[in-house]
Amino acid sequence: MLTTRRVRFYGRVQGINFRSNTLVKALELGVKGWIKNLPDGSVEALFSGESEQIEKLISYCVSNMPYAEVKRYDVYIEPYTEFQDFQIKR
């Protein structure tokens, strides 16, 4: 089922290639959308695609991301949005 999720990651998630590692994994899983650093030190992402693949991507970000220490993450259901690719926003 196609779905879109907005996710905020908190903890040690900036300055450790979190966004670029997420981009690589998203491309591997066929997830589209974007990811960006926020001024408060968190990272926000919008993941769009098959719900199972999005869950795998979130799990990777939370549990298997090199050097990251995700203390908390919030997931929000969004209206489905179609993207052409996955981007790192600056």
UniProtKB/Swiss-Prot annotation:
Keywords: Hydrolase. PROSITE patterns: ACYLPHOSPHATASE_3. One of its GO terms (molecular function) is acylphosphatase activity. Pfam families: Acylphosphatase (PF00708). It catalyses: an acyl phosphate + H2O = a carboxylate + phosphate + H(+). Residues 4-90 form the Acylphosphatase-like domain. Belongs to the acylphosphatase family. This is Acylphosphatase. It comes from Thermoplasma volcanium (strain ATCC 51530 / DSM 4299 / JCM 9571 / NBRC 15438 / GSS1). The gene is acyP.
